[in-house]
């Protein structure tokens, strides 16, 4: 009797954990859906829910940084980009967005430092490398 109870209890908790895991995957997908529909308030809600359950999902942090940029919240954008780069220092898109943010804020030294890293790791966004270098030089003058 006690063995049966433990068995059913363990099955119950396993099923509950499995459902919770599946729901967590849906948070990111829902966030993407709303982001693509330009419903940034809903997207932000789902990306934040996702990082509660999956604290190392750099993609959620990256999308939250994009939402912060749209909302003109540079401090929050910077925080999210820093988190992405802690999780994955070679994330090209985060490096690119960080450089643009540094240029916008007038911090050309940080923009140059990030641009050096970006130049070494770029694979998909390399076409933007020359544009960034020109922006840093032009804006610095």
What would you call each of these model-derived segments?
Residues 112-141:
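Terminal, low-structured helical/coil segments at or just beyond the last alpha-helical repeat
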Residues 49-50, 83-84, 117-118:
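Canonical positions in the second alpha-helix
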Residues 63, 97, 131-135:
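Canonical tetratricopeptide repeat
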Residues 36-37, 70-71, 104-105, 135-141:
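Register position in tetratricopeptide repeats
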């Amino acid at each position: 009797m006690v063995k049966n109870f433990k068995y059913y209890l363990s099955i119950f908790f396993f099923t509950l954990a499995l459902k919770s895991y599946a729901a967590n995957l849906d948070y990111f997908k829902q966030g993407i859906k709303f982001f693509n529909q330009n419903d940034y308030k809903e997207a932000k809600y789902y990306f934040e829910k996702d990082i509660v359950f999956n604290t190392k999902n750099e993609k959620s942090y990256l999308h939250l940084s994009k939402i912060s940029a749209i909302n003109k919240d540079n401090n929050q954008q910077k925080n999210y980009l820093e988190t992405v780069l802690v999780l994955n220092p070679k994330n090209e898109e985060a490096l690119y967005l960080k450089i643009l943010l540094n240029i916008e804020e007038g911090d050309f030294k940080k923009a140059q430092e990030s641009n050096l890293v970006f130049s070494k790791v770029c694979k998909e966004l390399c076409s933007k490398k020359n544009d960034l270098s020109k922006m840093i030089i032009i804006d610095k003058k």
